Amino acid sequence: MSWKKRNYANIYKKSLAVQKRNEKEVETVREEAELHQLILSVGQRVGARAIGLSGSRTDPQAPKDFLQDFDVVYVMDDIQPLVDDPSWLEAFGPIMIRQTPEASTIYPPSLGGCFTYLMHFLDGVRIDLMLCPLALVDRLANEPGLQPLLDPDQILSFANQANHSHYWIKRPTQAAFQEHCNEFWWVSTYVVKGLLRKQLIYAADHLYTICWQELLWIEDLFVAQAQQFQVSTGKNHKYLQSFLTEKEWRELTSLLDFSTITACGQSLLKMQKRFDKQAKNISEKLGLAYDWQEAENVQAYTKYWSEKNWQMEPENQK
């Protein structure tokens, strides 16, 4: 059968149907209490000295649903045997897909001696399991919301179960504010260049990966300053919508149309207008200097080419 003709929804359902637990078919996500017990039992079986849970599962402010990851850490005397032979992970259940970032050949290691197994199971459960050598346990001190699940030797005594302030949006310095604003306006000119050359992917890539991200950064600041910088909009700004009115949300998401040269150009113009407005608001509320002349110059440049329908003069095409 051609891969184009496969019904992947049915394939997934069939893969669920073959799972067995207590001789019964499993087609639902396992309960949180059951997962906690499983995490403890597997950890004890492999010799974990301490077991901790962090992330959104320990954050009382995080919305609760079955899609929340279980961010788990096993503190081990020696993690290498568990890295060399991952067969012990089978005890958690059938895995749909797995990643091991610290073993990646395309990205450099980032945990300095710890190792993670990122696992998405067939029933929908997601566990991000970090193996931390006992000698490196101090590195967990800044793990947001770390909550000991098993710690007979008080290895995780430094854990602060209620501390999620690590996630709070930080008040920017003058230098940081200036650099973020400059980056937005500077990269705007790359988008214009791509539009004039009819290089849609080039233009859209710069608009989304840089300009859009800088806009979200300043949207976060506007939210945070109203909350005395004691708030988080979540990873990848996933909670930002809850701080905006329906109108504001529609206006923001309308900027994500990069499907044509014209649409991408309109998104750039609207994005610039919104960024400029929010930057001025932040400048006033936080007492930060904003280079309005830089902003006006780039907006005028963008508007000039927009009014020419992103068409270069013939003499400039040579």
Please report, for each region that a protein language model flagged, where it lies by residue.
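Conserved NTP/Mg2+-binding pocket subregion across the NTase superfamily
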Residues: 12, 19-25, 94-202, 206-208, ...
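Metal-dependent nucleotidyltransferase catalytic core
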Residues: 19-46, 54-67, 72-130
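Short aromatic-enriched loop/helix-cap "lid" or pocket-rim segments at secondary-structure transitions
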Residues: 64-66, 141-143, 233
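Conserved nucleotidyltransferase catalytic core and NTase-mimicking acidic/glycine-rich helix/loop elements
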Residues: 168-318
